[in-house]
Curated annotation (Swiss-Prot):
This is Carbamoyl phosphate synthase small chain. It comes from Mycobacterium leprae (strain TN). The gene is carA. It catalyses: hydrogencarbonate + L-glutamine + 2 ATP + H2O = carbamoyl phosphate + L-glutamate + 2 ADP + phosphate + 2 H(+). Residues 184-375 form the Glutamine amidotransferase type-1 domain. Composed of two chains; the small (or glutamine) chain promotes the hydrolysis of glutamine to ammonia, which is used by the large (or ammonia) chain to synthesize carbamoyl phosphate. Tetramer of heterodimers (alpha,beta)4.
Length: 375
């Protein structure tokens, strides 16, 4: 039986068997604790240039379908996939094929049969790090582990990686509302998931999805009732254009809502700095405290960077007073910020879920209420 290797930059090597395409891939090794929703994970643009390790032991049981993808064309965005026990068949009435067939079709190199618990414990202790998956001719014969480790180390770090332009749409497009149109939103695509415009559409909102390179004049031409900042990959410290654009929007008084990467962008626009987390938050059961109400929501998350700040912290900005509105109950990481006057707010987690709980879906309604009040 042929074998595959997961090689980490610190020299740790895990041996398994090929899963998906044969060859090599490089990326940042991260882990996701979700017990379900692997198709949504694989197609989430926020995972661009990352090798995802699944903590759930069995992956692929429900195969692959043409409904659950979170990218517009069902593109798989992960750089590689590492699993313990993949299902060789698809057991679901919606399935159009197996997970491995789709990985092969999209040329995603993966590895199976490894001790994913050991990998996760290693990443928790030492942090997310550069990695590579190698199989077939890419393993270099005779096998030279040190050469593979050196190859892994040559890739760019996620720290300082400007990836938004690679994940954003090149051309603007429109997602029409369901039923009567109530509002128009300019949605800045920093790596947007398809379920977000769907949530807007269900609330009667027409979404103009714009590339990350959009200018304020292009936004103003739409005459939107609000601006949405999406999720996305890479280091938010590199997104200076989007931060400057956000400040223009705030100066214009346009209501603003951001999620995930968009939370980091709003935070930077308000004067906060960002940092790279040790291993990040990636899962669908992460508790978040809303400090205005004391309520806890179980949330879906996918981020390796976060805003500096503390629970309930108030701070002055050029746009008025702001506050750290949400933090993670597990580790105190900032999970939301907002302007005190309420015209701009953002959260680090994913209220649109896909996959995950719907505890925070009310935030879309909060955005609708904000736009209605500013109309």
């Amino acid at each position: 039986m042929s074998k595959a290797l997961l090689v980490l930059e610190d020299g740790r090597v895990f041996t398994g068997m090929p899963f998906g395409a044969i060859g090599q891939t490089l990326g940042e090794a991260v882990f996701s604790t979700g017990m379900s929703g692997y198709q949504e994970t694989l197609t989430d643009p926020s995972y661009h240039r990352q090798i995802v390790v699944a903590t759930a032991p069995q992956i692929g049981n429900t195969g692959w379908n043409d409904q659950d993808g979170e990218s517009r064309d069902d593109r798989i965005w992960v750089a590689g996939y590492a699993v313990r026990d993949p299902s060789p068949c698809a057991s679901n009435w919606r399935a159009t094929g197996t997970l491995e067939d789709e990985l092969v079709r999209q040329r995603i190199v993966g590895i199976a049969g490894i001790d994913t618990r050991a990998v996760v414990r290693h990443l928790r202790r030492y942090g997310s790090m550069k990695a590579g998956v190698f199989s077939g001719k890419a393993m270099i014969e005779p096998l030279n582990i040190e050469a593979l480790v050196q190859h892994v180390r040559t890739q760019q770090s996620m720290l300082g990686a400007d990836l938004v332009g690679e994940a954003s749409t090149l051309d603007a497009y429109v997602v029409e509302p369901k039923g009567k149109e109530r509002f128009t939103v300019a949605a800045l695509d920093l790596g947007i998931k398809t379920n977000t415009p769907r949530n807007f559409a269900r609330r009667g909102i027409r979404s103009y999805v714009l590339p990350a390179s959009a200018t304020f004049n292009q936004i103003a031409d739409i005459k939107p009732h609000g601006l949405f900042l999406s999720n996305g990959p890479g280091d938010p410290a590199t997104a200076d254009h989007v931060v400057a654009l956000t400040r223009e929007v705030l100066n214009a008084g346009i209501p603003l809502f951001g999620i995930c990467f968009g939370n980091q962008i709003l935070g930077r626009a308000l004067g906060l700095s960002t940092y790279k987390m040790v291993f990040g938050h990636r899962g669908i059961n992460i508790p978040v405290i809303d400090h205005a109400t004391g309520r806890v929501a179980v949330t879906a998350q996918n981020h390796g960077f976060a805003l500096e700040g503390e629970a309930g912290q108030s701070f002055d900005t050029p746009f008025g007073s702001a506050v750290v509105s949400h933090t993670c109950a597990n580790d105190g990481v900032v999970e939301g910020v907002k302007l005190a006057d309420g015209r701009a707010f953002s959260v680090q987690y994913h209220p649109e879920a896909a996959a995950g709980p719907h505890d925070a879906e009310y935030l879309f309604d909060s955005f609708v209420e904000l736009m209605a009040a500013q109309r």
